[in-house]
């Protein structure tokens, strides 16, 4: 499949000044620098070059599998560093794949950009009844921008429905305790990926500890002013499911510390009972 897509892209570049390509631009230098600083906390180093190549990120991903920290949590850091692939009427390299020419000519699914490429190739071979532009009534610039936009919309719809279904599922586990791993750190709390289920939830910063936490955006780390406790991506954390909002696809978690009573407090019980009643309305 990859070889066919490369071959088609090369043919397009030989016959047309503009076509339909799948491009992926390199990550910004600042994003790479910040990623390297975070990965060093886990003993992982990106290649010491000014502009890391795709193979350097691939080597880092391999090194991540040797870490005690869950792979998914570290992989997410790399993905956040990357730009999104998109469609373009101008031929540009595909950074993540490491290809100079790439397009979507064939795949397990049939996309509209594939059809545009087919029409262009037929035009080049002299067997197409219509050019890609005439068939769509749009310029290639407009087609590429439109296909990129609708792809983002489809991805967002997929994420939204997945989040709602996960929230609905976790609504059956209110008050239950789970082991998890910190998958994201923000100024307002941490996201925890549960070990038992492929689900992430938010532990609000007010639920972390009896302390005030300072957020280090560069190292993605929270540090307690009084306790000096540090919370970062990859840390293990025991949590309890406190509440869910199915409509918004949100899951609220509460941190369980060793000194905490494992039973549900009256305040938590009251809040959860109230949330359940609200969800039934």
How would you name each of these model-derived features?
Residues 1-195, 202, 209, 214, ...:
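Append "with occasional cross-activation on large, charged helical scaffolds in nucleic-acid assemblies
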Residues 173-176, 213-239:
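Short nucleic-acid-contacting surface segments enriched for D/E, G, S/T with interspersed K/R
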Residues 194, 233-271:
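OB-fold/S1-family single-stranded nucleic acid-binding modules
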Residues 200-201, 222:
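Glycine-centered structural positions embedded in regular secondary structure
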Residues 212-221, 255-281:
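Acidic, low-complexity intrinsically disordered tails
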């Amino acid at each position: 499949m990859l070889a066919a897509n490369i071959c088609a892209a090369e043919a397009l570049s030989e016959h047309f000044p503009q076509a339909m390509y799948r491009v992926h631009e390199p990550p910004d230098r600042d994003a790479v620098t910040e990623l390297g600083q975070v990965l060093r906390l886990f003993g992982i180093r990106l290649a010491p070059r000014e502009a890391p190549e795709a193979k350097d990120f691939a080597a880092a991903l391999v090194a991540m599998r040797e870490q005690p920290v869950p792979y998914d949590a570290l992989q997410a850091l790399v993905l956040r560093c990357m730009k999104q692939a998109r469609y373009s009427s101008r031929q540009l390299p595909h950074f993540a794949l490491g290809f100079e020419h790439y397009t979507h000519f064939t795949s397990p699914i049939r996309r509209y950009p594939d059809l545009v490429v087919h029409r262009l190739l037929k035009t080049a071979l002299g067997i197409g009844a219509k050019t890609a532009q005439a068939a769509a009534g749009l310029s290639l610039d407009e087609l590429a921008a439109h296909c990129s936009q609708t792809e983002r919309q489809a991805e967002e719809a997929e994420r939204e429905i997945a989040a709602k279904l996960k929230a609905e599922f976790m609504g059956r586990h209110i008050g239950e305790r789970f082991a998890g791993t910190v998958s994201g750190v923000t100024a307002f709390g941490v996201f925890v990926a549960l070990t038992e289920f492929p689900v992430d939830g938010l532990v609000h910063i007010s639920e972390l500890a009896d302390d005030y936490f300072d957020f280090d955006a560069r190292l993605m780390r929270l540090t307690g002013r009084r306790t000096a406790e540090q919370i970062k991506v990859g840390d293990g954390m025991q949590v309890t499911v406190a509440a869910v909002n199915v409509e918004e696809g949100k899951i609220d978690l509460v941190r369980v510390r060793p000194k905490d009573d494992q039973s549900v407090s009256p305040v938590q019980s009251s809040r959860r009972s109230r949330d359940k009643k609200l969800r039934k309305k």
